[in-house]
Amino acid sequence: MHIWVDADACPSVIKDILFRVADRLQLNVTLVANQLMRVPGSRFIRALQVPAGADAADAEIVARVSPGDIVVTGDIPLASLVLEKGGLPLNPRGEWYTKDTIAQQLTMRAFMEELRGSGVDTGGPAAFSQADRQNFANALDRELARRRNHSGPR
């Protein structure tokens, strides 16, 4: 199992959680970004810089993800592609994307884009909070504990 991170927009507190998890559980974590990323010196953590461009990091993650891998992303279209490949997408607020919910999330995203395109101010997401950080840590911990106990993806 591998943890892939759509790192350009991932909050640093989430990356810090992932760095600790990688070393504690000896799991491979790769941050994929189109900018240079600094990562701690660890044999389990690496950064992969891709060329600048729309969705270059997404394409790299999709090309490399295997069934059962976890992908940390807030990008709904990327999450949909990860699900198609058998990966488990988790957003930085601790919510798992699932085959049951992804179509509705894609529809809502398209609707909000249409509203913004017509000049409607839809606001943005709420500021990232301590509760979001905790929700992420708990969701990741539950999945990793489940895998240790049952040796397989959910």
Swiss-Prot record:
Task: Read off the Pfam families from this record.
Answer: DUF188
Which InterPro entries is this protein grouped with?
A: UPF0178 (IPR003791)
Q: Write the signal peptide boundaries.
A: none
Family of this protein: Belongs to the UPF0178 family.
PANTHER family the record matches: UPF0178 PROTEIN YAII (PTHR35146:SF1)
Protein name per the record: UPF0178 protein in pahZ1 5'region
UniProt source species: Paucimonas lemoignei
